[in-house]
Amino acid sequence: MTSQRTRERLIQRLYEEGLSNAHVLEVIRRTPRHLFVDEALSHRAYEDTALPIGHNQTISQPFMVARMTELLLAAGPLDKVMEIGTGSGYQTAVLAQLVERVFSVERIQALQDKAKERLAELNLRNVVFRWGDGWEGWSALAPYNGIIVTAAATEVPQSLLDQLAPGGRLVIPVGGGEVQQLMLIVRTEDGFSRQVLDSVRFVPLLNGPIA
């Protein structure tokens, strides 16, 4: 079930659900999602659903990957994006094909090691990885034109706001319950603009790296 037809069916569904950025949809189409899940689940790779990847984590629903990526790129191309939560590496791979450089932070080293292997297999070389606490971001390489967070924070981390460049965009799910709110935050001349968008379901953004 990893045929081109199943991929096309997924893209058609995303388009019908309101996603319209042709560049994002094309990258979703050509990115082999089945490589980012366990072989036992590969037959479900092109369903529009989140799937388990171990360590109580999931690979995000393709709609949400596309939605968050569209929001990040809505103001134009970006050259420097930080991703909080490498996970399987699928969102990382999508970003790597759309922006100049991706800086990806993951607290679970085993997940990040697998993600590195997958991106190398796809010859995506514009990603730098850090094993660490996503709440802290990666201040040594800040600022970033875009930040995308793939787990739900109970509140917007101040450290991530501090690492956003002027005009930069932060896409993040916020909330402590089972259902959270997807937010778009833009750094302006006099502070930050905040927009609440969709109700979403993400695993929580936790503190502290795990070897």
Swiss-Prot record:
<dbReference type="GO" id="GO:0004719">
    <property type="term" value="F:protein-L-isoaspartate (D-aspartate) O-methyltransferase activity"/>
</dbReference>
<feature type="active site">
    <location>
        <position position="60"/>
    </location>
</feature>
<keyword id="KW-0808">Transferase</keyword>
<comment type="subunit">
    <text>Monomer.</text>
</comment>
<dbReference type="GO" id="GO:0032259">
    <property type="term" value="P:methylation"/>
</dbReference>
<protein>
    <recommendedName>
        <fullName>Protein-L-isoaspartate O-methyltransferase</fullName>
        <ecNumber>2.1.1.77</ecNumber>
    </recommendedName>
</protein>
<dbReference type="GO" id="GO:0005737">
    <property type="term" value="C:cytoplasm"/>
</dbReference>
<dbReference type="GO" id="GO:0030091">
    <property type="term" value="P:protein repair"/>
</dbReference>
<dbReference type="GO" id="GO:0036211">
    <property type="term" value="P:protein modification process"/>
</dbReference>
<dbReference type="InterPro" id="IPR000682">
    <property type="entry name" value="PCMT"/>
</dbReference>
<keyword id="KW-0963">Cytoplasm</keyword>
<dbReference type="Pfam" id="PF01135">
    <property type="entry name" value="PCMT"/>
</dbReference>
<dbReference type="InterPro" id="IPR029063">
    <property type="entry name" value="SAM-dependent_MTases_sf"/>
</dbReference>
<keyword id="KW-0489">Methyltransferase</keyword>
<comment type="similarity">
    <text>Belongs to the methyltransferase superfamily. L-isoaspartyl/D-aspartyl protein methyltransferase family.</text>
</comment>
<keyword id="KW-0949">S-adenosyl-L-methionine</keyword>
<comment type="function">
    <text>Catalyzes the methyl esterification of L-isoaspartyl residues in peptides and proteins that result from spontaneous decomposition of normal L-aspartyl and L-asparaginyl residues. It plays a role in the repair and/or degradation of damaged proteins.</text>
</comment>
